Amino acid sequence: MSNYGVVHTGDVVYTKSPLKANPYGIIKANKGKPGIVSVLYGVYHTRENANADFIQMYFEQDARLNNYLRPLVNKGAKNTLLISDTDALEGEVCLAPTFDEQKAIGQFFDSLDNLITLHQRKYDKLQVLKKAMLEKMFPKNGSSV
């Protein structure tokens, strides 16, 4: 079990895997159930004055995340990210003055994300309907309406 980290709901997780838009990894809050992760992930328990959802929203923009991590991360020969869990916390993060304000901001953006997801599903269903209607109106060669 020493090769794994325990992640609790509300913890902040740093994924030390380079991605196209995030070459230094990503930072997310665990909004789901507790679980375990490999040592390739840095797991952080937030302080009493810091809200995990706010921290995730703070790092939502690729440019801000990359600017935060760039000076802290060294890239290895195989494009691995060489950074200790402690070093990942060395950068400056501008938090809202109070925990309640951070929580409200995090909830606001969560609500927006949920609304976007809802509208995306509606859009996807309308795209399927449009395709079906076009196929019925304009059948392929040799087909009848």
Model-derived features: positions:
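Feature detects amphipathic, helix-rich regulatory segments
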Residues: 1-145
